[in-house]
């Protein structure tokens, strides 16, 4: 996903993954697993035969028998005779339900970090002790590994060129702009003039089409991403309340000026997704999840979907801002088939094992999503939302904190940021307590 709405946590990042197989008799050092192309565009994993006939359990809310990964799961089982079984756990109460399974001795093998960071650390195994992972392989995204580590010990991973991370971007309804003779975001981008000011210009012109039009949906966290800043930082295995950062204040003022002017809406829910699809909204600050066949805009004609990077704060900025959801995968404590699960993750997270037409609305949209990997000079990873949800374990509970800002006005931003900072102190403390507890037991 992050890039994520205030009412949901979708949200990462790109990462690469490789595995070790068992070494020869008498050696405790595994041999690096080398994927080879077998001629049908998928990956062959040497050394996997030892796990034939076994089952890997995957805790997720997605029915992958019907998702964009359906063919990938089926081909893995067909090639390697390893069954993948879903353990269904709802997205919004994932942490609490998973913790209950672990406590009851019913641990799945694979777990998903999807906006709950760092609440899943206590139920995750350290990956450096699983012999079929080679975490130094450049298939893995080292940025994700660093975030998914405590005191240098890795717990979570993802791949660089994976379909299972979500990159921040701006989506716009081409038809709204073309039918009304409004200069489009892409035209500004092609002029190298795609900034927060021209974003506002686009939103203003759309909003003037009528009282039922919204210029742009801009969630608070995505406004911060545009300004290159996070509400909660994670550095050196420690969370830091970053609400006092000047750029956070600048992002909030920019957002709330747009709200006050009735050109921005800071909330995105299902009705708002429909408003964009139906042509009553110009732009959405979202992620490339919106370009997926399974995404919230799937009812929209793909020819009407426009997409481009988030705008620069200043035209002179060297780079367009880049953010990724902190989507990552781990092996659960108590997993019964961790080594085979590692092989499956290597296969599942490799975009080469997918048909692009099963994932994105078009090949062009797929190319755009992955082109943002090339822009990842210093991508922001979405860690803030998980910290704000940590006290109750519900993935959508951060919205109540965001309302401290979004339910007010631009004139009140400075005062409201102080309240916001005070309100989340308990969340930051609990997040750091989790890190300390897990780190102390390594």
Protein language model annotation of sequence segments:
Residues 39-52, 114-167, 197, 308:
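Hinge/lid segment of periplasmic solute-binding proteins
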Residues 63-81, 175-177:
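Short, polar/charged alpha-helical segment
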Residues 74-144, 149, 180, 282-283, ...:
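Extracytoplasmic "Venus flytrap"/periplasmic binding protein-like
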Residues 83, 338, 352-442:
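Conserved C-terminal helix/tail region of periplasmic/extracytoplasmic solute-binding proteins
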Residues 131-140, 188-191, 231-250, 299, ...:
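Short, solvent-exposed loop/beta-turn-alpha elements that line the ligand-binding surface or hinge
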Residues 152, 298-363:
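Extracytoplasmic/periplasmic substrate-recognition and gating elements
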Residues 153-168, 178, 192-240:
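Extracytoplasmic/periplasmic solute-binding protein
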Residues 201-203, 237-269:
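Glycine-centered hinge/linker elements that transmit conformational signals in sensory
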């Amino acid at each position: 996903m992050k890039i994520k709405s205030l009412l949901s946590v979708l949200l990462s990042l790109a990462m690469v993954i490789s595995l070790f197989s068992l070494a020869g008799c008498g050696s405790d050092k595994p041999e690096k697993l080398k994927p080879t192309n077998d001629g049908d565009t998928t990956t062959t994993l040497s050394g996997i035969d030892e796990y034939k006939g076994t089952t890997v359990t995957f805790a997720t809310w997605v029915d992958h028998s019907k998702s964009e990964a359906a063919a990938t799961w089926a081909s893995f089982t067909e090639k390697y005779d390893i069954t993948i079984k879903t353990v269904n756990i709802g997205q919004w109460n994932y942490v609490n339900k998973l913790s209950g399974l672990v406590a009851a001795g019913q641990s799945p093998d694979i777990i998903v970090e999807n906006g709950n960071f760092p609440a899943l650390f206590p139920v995750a195994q350290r990956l450096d002790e699983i012999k079929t992972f080679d975490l130094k392989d450049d298939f893995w995204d080292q940025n994700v590994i660093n975030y998914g580590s405590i005191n240098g010990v890795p717990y979570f991973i993802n791949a660089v060129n994976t379909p299972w991370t979500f990159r921040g971007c701006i989506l716009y309804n081409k038809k709204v702009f073309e039918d009304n003779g409004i200069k489009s975001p892409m035209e500004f981008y092609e002029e190298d003039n795609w900034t927060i000011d021209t974003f506002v210009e686009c939103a203003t012109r759309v909003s003037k089409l009528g009282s039922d039009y919204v210029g742009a949906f801009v969630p608070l966290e995505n406004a911060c991403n545009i300004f290159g800043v996070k509400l909660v930082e994670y550095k050196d295995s420690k969370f830091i309340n970053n609400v006092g950062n000047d750029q956070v204040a600048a992002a909030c003022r920019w957002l709330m000026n747009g709200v006050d002017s009735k050109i921005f809406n800071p909330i995105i829910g299902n009705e708002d997704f429909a408003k964009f699809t139906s042509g009553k909204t110009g732009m959405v600050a979202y992620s490339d999840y919106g370009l997926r066949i399974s995404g919230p805009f799937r009812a929209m004609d793909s020819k009407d979907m426009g997409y481009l990077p988030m705008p620069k704060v200043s035209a002179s900025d060297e780079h367009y801002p880049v953010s990724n959801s902190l989507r990552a995968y781990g092996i659960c404590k108590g997993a019964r088939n961790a080594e085979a699960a590692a092989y499956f993750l290597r296969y599942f997270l490799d975009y080469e094992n997918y048909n692009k037409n099963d994932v994105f609305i078009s090949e062009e949209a797929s190319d755009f999503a992955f082109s943002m990997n090339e822009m990842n000079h210093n991508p922001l990873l979405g860690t803030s939302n998980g910290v704000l949800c940590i006290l109750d374990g519900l993935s959508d509970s951060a919205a109540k904190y965001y309302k401290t800002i979004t339910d007010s006005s631009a004139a009140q931003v400075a005062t409201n940021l102080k309240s916001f900072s005070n309100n989340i102190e308990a969340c930051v403390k609990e997040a750091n307590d989790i890190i300390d507890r897990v780190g102390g037991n390594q």
